[in-house]
Swiss-Prot record:
GO terms for molecular function: carbohydrate binding; natural killer cell lectin-like receptor binding. Lectin-type cell surface receptor. Glycans are attached at residue 150. Residues 30-43 have a biased composition (Low complexity). It comes from Rattus norvegicus. The keyword Disulfide bond applies. Residues 137-242 form the C-type lectin domain. Residues 16-29 have a biased composition (Polar residues). Residues 100-252 are extracellular. Its main location: membrane. Residues 1-78 are cytoplasmic. It is found in: Cell membrane. This is C-type lectin domain family 2 member D3. One of its GO terms (cellular component) is external side of plasma membrane.
Length: 252
């Protein structure tokens, strides 16, 4: 039998052996240190690193891996800015309040001074004076009538002027009335119910008998003899009114 016939008739085991040998030869060739092997190794390494989780790569870096330094600085800057803004608001506000308080104090002081000045000016611009046609003496004003009437009418006339029939409280006032009246007899405010009763003024205060009163009449008058005399109520005479001086304001 020829050699080719022997090869064709070889059992399947030999064919499997040849195929295995060829695979081992191919594997040895692919595992050699050529360029293709190096590239494959590098690709595998890159793929491995890219698949490692980010948190594991940064593991062990502590606070910096959670709060990076740039973020901490940013928070510090924010805090500084807020502090500066707060100071910029509070300081001017405090200054403004202080200025307003000073202004209010100044206004209050000025108002008080103005009130005091006004009060002083009011006092300085007032004076005691008597009405027109009245004569001033001491702290009183006197009116000497130019007409005549009975004692009752004379009393009512003086009351209508806010006064009373003349009253003297000192001898100096009496002497003034005597000099000023001239030679005529004038009704004054003395009266009594009868010769058995005391003399009184129109306000019913009792006369102090500074000067004795002559006559037996019920009403007193200043006589032309510079004395005080009495007469009947119906006799007509001129009269004298008296009242205290009042302070009046003087216009500027």
């Amino acid at each position: 039998m020829s050699s080719s016939a022997h090869l064709q008739d070889a059992p399947p085991l030999l064919s499997g052996t040849l195929t295995q040998n060829e695979g081992q030869t191919s594997l040895r060739q692919s595992s050699s240190c050529g360029p293709s092997a190096a590239s494959a190794s590098e690709s595998l390494s890159g793929y491995t690193e890219s698949r490692i989780p980010h948190s594991k790569v940064r593991q062990g870096k502590g606070l910096r891996s959670i709060f990076p330094e740039s973020r901490v600085k940013r928070y510090c800057c924010y805090g500084g800015v807020i502090t500066v803004v707060a100071i910029a608001i509070v300081v001017p506000l405090s200054v403004t309040l202080s200025v307003k308080q000073m202004e209010q104090t100044s206004i209050n002081n000025t108002s008080a001074a103005s009130i005091n000045n006004t009060s002083a000016a009011s006092i300085n611009n007032t004076s005691a004076a008597c009405p027109s046609n009245w004569t001033e003496y001491g702290n009183k004003c006197f009116y000497f009538s130019e007409y005549t009437s009975n004692w009752t009418f004379s009393k009512d006339f003086c009351a209508a002027q806010g006064a009373e029939l003349a009253r003297f409280d000192t001898e100096e006032e009496l002497n003034f009335l005597k000099r000023y009246k001239g030679s005529s007899g004038y009704w004054i405010g003395l009266h009594r119910e009868s010769s058995e009763h005391p003399w009184k003024w129109t306000d019913n205060t009792q006369y102090n008998n500074l000067i004795p009163i002559r006559g037996d009449g019920q009403c007193g008058f200043l006589s032309d003899q510079l004395n005080i005399s009495s007469s009947r109520v119906y006799v007509e005479r001129p009269w004298i009114c008296s009242k205290p001086k009042k302070y009046i304001s003087q216009s500027q």
